[in-house]
Curated annotation (Swiss-Prot):
Class of enzymatic activity (EC top level): hydrolase
Gene Ontology molecular function: acylphosphatase activity
Lineage, opening ranks: Bacteria, Pseudomonadati, Pseudomonadota, Gammaproteobacteria, Enterobacterales
PANTHER family per record: ACYLPHOSPHATASE
Protein known as: Acylphosphatase
Gene3D superfamilies according to UniProt: 3.30.70.100
Family listed: Belongs to the acylphosphatase family.
Keyword Membrane assigned: no
Gene name tied to this protein: yccX
Record keywords, A-Z: Disulfide bond, Hydrolase
Active site: 20, 38
InterPro entries membership: Acylphosphatase, Acylphosphatase-like_dom, Acylphosphatase-like_dom_sf, Acylphosphatase_bac, Acylphosphatase_CS
Organism: Escherichia coli O1:K1 / APEC
Protein EC: 3.6.1.7
Catalysed reactions listed for this entry: an acyl phosphate + H2O = a carboxylate + phosphate + H(+)
Domain Acylphosphatase-like: 5-92
Length: 92
């Protein structure tokens, strides 16, 4: 498998519902590095890097709604080239 990085924006009821923390848990379980952070517009930004198949699993998890308390309306993602090395999956 090749290594890839993506950046995704998740829209809906995704702040104040544990979205970043459960995303971190799922990403670490899949062996990914990157981060999840809240944006001012109420969305969450996720950068995930790792094996292509594992990154795709995280994207599918995000699209399926994330944690039970969240309500995901839309997920946009694209390839990403982070400026620095990501050694863990963090919450920002």
């Amino acid at each position: 498998m090749s290594k890839v990085c993506i950046i995704a924006w998740i829209y809906g009821r995704v702040q104040g519902v544990g979205f970043r923390y459960t995303t971190q848990y799922e990403a670490k379980k899949l062996g990914l590095t990157g981060y999840a952070k809240n944006l001012d517009d109420g969305s969450v930004e996720v950068v995930a890097c790792g094996d292509e198949g594992q990154v795709e699993k995280l994207i599918q998890w995000l699209k399926s709604g994330g944690p039970r308390s969240a309500r995901v309306e839309r997920v946009l993602s694209e390839p990403h080239h982070p400026s620095g090395e990501l050694t863990d999956f963090r919450i920002r």
